Amino acid sequence: MRCPKCLLCLSALLTLLGLKVYIEWTSESRLSKAYPSPRGTPPSPTPANPEPTLPANLSTRLGQTIPLPFAYWNQQQWRLGSLPSGDSTETGGCQAWGAAAATEIPDFASYPKDLRRFLLSAACRSFPQWLPGGGGSQVSSCSDTDVPYLLLAVKSEPGRFAERQAVRETWGSPAPGIRLLFLLGSPVGEAGPDLDSLVAWESRRYSDLLLWDFLDVPFNQTLKDLLLLAWLGRHCPTVSFVLRAQDDAFVHTPALLAHLRALPPASARSLYLGEVFTQAMPLRKPGGPFYVPESFFEGGYPAYASGGGYVIAGRLAPWLLRAAARVAPFPFEDVYTGLCIRALGLVPQAHPGFLTAWPADRTADHCAFRNLLLVRPLGPQASIRLWKQLQDPRLQC
């Protein structure tokens, strides 16, 4: 009596195994057709950062730590994960995506003004470069004979002239293998002073302003990241590393270059380096700049590097842009980058030399900076003074 039962069980197990193999094979086949690879070879796998891939259904990765309650962002992410190949957040029109947010979020009217504005236009990711009325200069592409090893992509705002000049005179000053760019939106808008002619003069003088025709407000910082990734793909695809930093950061450029050049090649190819936050949760207290309503997002944040300053491998740019098309918009650029990194199956690398909450009372101690790579915030005068001290060959620590 036992033998027939054993044979029946064995037959059932073999059938289930065959079905599993078939499902995995057909799923992998659909994935390869739905997502052609970006140009070039993907970053090499490493034990900490395996080769990036983009699942046909992103919920296989994002859904592991993001629950599916009634929060709007979570619902949108699951919808994006099931879209057909080629569809993204702009499918059906980016304004339509924003209008849906206003109608589907029951307490949308109670959201802070900036968050409401973000949601109404968050899916709009295609903006032309902006040329000042005074005839500013377009930023040149990276030439085949002059590809930067490290691109310094610094987020700024039109009126922060002193901060940009301080960067030019200090850690962003000309050096072999270094190129400096500032990322700005349009200086036109929101009842401020007319900065058009001043920005035009600055653009002609330095040719280092990447300007786009969108309103430069805090919740558009994610947009700057996405437009930079697209610009890199068209104009500087072979850059080795990209530092994305705020204009009030101070970077010990020689120390950062030394660290990057010492990295093992496999690690360098998929690098996402900075001051890493893990197991962070949304702030639920209304009134703060990082307030997130429960009706918008539920769950914890992914591991991410602080938006004050971090480094990515240049080879990751097309992969991040590809992932971003299938990750629902989020108002904080560092968290959003962390979501895209996780969608690619990568993890951030923490470095103790990145400190984005530097205490003001330590600024006078220039020796404290010898082993650091990036700190913020520092004002223009403090940055210039510190840079001169660090360049002094007589410096004793």
Swiss-Prot record:
Stretches assigned to the Cytoplasmic side: 1-6
Keyword terms: Glycoprotein, Glycosyltransferase, Golgi apparatus, Membrane, Signal-anchor, Transferase, Transmembrane, Transmembrane helix
Effect of residue 246 to A: Loss of enzymatic activity, no loss of B3GNT2-binding and activation
One of the record's GO molecular function terms: protein N-acetylglucosaminyltransferase activity
Membrane-topology annotation of the record: Single-pass type II membrane protein
GO biological process, one term: O-glycan processing
Recorded metabolic or biological pathway in which this protein acts: Protein modification; protein glycosylation
Lumenal side: 24-397
Keyword Protein transport recorded: no
Tissue: Highly expressed in small intestine, pancreas, spleen, bone marrow, lung, throat, and ileum, and weakly in fetal brain, cerebellum, heart, liver, tongue, breast, uteri, and testis. Not detected in colon. Differentially expressed in human tumor cell lines.
Enzyme Commission numbers on file: 2.4.1.-
Function: Beta-1,3-N-acetylglucosaminyltransferase that plays a role in the elongation of specific branch structures of multiantennary N-glycans. Has strong activity towards tetraantennary N-glycans and 2,6 triantennary glycans.
Name recorded for this polypeptide: UDP-GlcNAc:betaGal beta-1,3-N-acetylglucosaminyltransferase 8
Organism, as annotated: Homo sapiens
